[in-house]
Amino acid sequence: AGRFTYNWNYRYFVDFNFGYTGSENFAPGNQFGFFPAFSLAWNVAEESFVKNNLKWMNMFKIRYSHGKVGNDNIGDNNRFPYLYTIATTGYNSEGKPNYVYNWGFGDYGKSFIGTRYTQMASNGITWEVATKDDLGIDLSLFNDKFTATVDYFHEKRTGIFLTREFLPEITGLESKPKANVGEVKSQGFDGNFALKQKLGEVDMTIRGNITYSKNEVLEKDEENQVYSYLYQKGYRVDQVKGLIAEGLFADYDDIRTSPKQEFGTVQPGDIKYKDVNGDGVVNDNDKVAIGATTTPNL
């Protein structure tokens, strides 16, 4: 790791740093990652045209930063994913082998006990990388009685460590392998302020802050879906999906003339759900994005 910092007269600022980091969680050849970052800042309040005319402005700093951050936290249960694991057959409570391999048919059929893979090796797994950009302003006025900070941030996270879902059944895998198959972008702004005032012998400070952030799943290894709205791609992380309620069933005639609700027997007074795809039935293929996520944007 290394860092270079330069400050000229508290007016211009330059900072560069980097890290070259290794992790035991990845296979040789993928263990190391290089993560650089830099930042630039300009304190406009130190310029003569401001100092001579706006004496009540103590600081007005404009700054920008760009950098990459690596993440090797794949969970204790997923350590060393580049190693495969196998298990012997073992026996159940009846004394019979758990895993039996059958060969041949009819009178020529044979059964053999053996071992099986419990985890496939994922040799290509490497660092999850977040590319971050931040544009901000730091403000201080009236001898630091009022201070404020505002930031706009943007992050694109690639190589997110997830379980593979788009795998054909003919692979015969008992457990799905892991891979760097996720990609998410997020952006928003963050602001805070502080107002300080002395009233006699009492020092008072009023503080406030606000944060707004939104994200979107750009890539995720998912099974094929009949309808595009069933994918998580294109929606927010942890987006809640469900059926759309259209009202209540008035009577049995209403039930008979409405799309069939496949999740159970309905009666008058039960909720009537919308047939989103128009196929005449209401089931999991009619679940769409509804409501907010588990983490609010604001």
Regions found by a protein language model. Give the residues of each.
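Flexible, solvent-exposed coil segments and beta strand-coil junctions
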Residues: 13-22, 44, 109-118, 164-176, ...
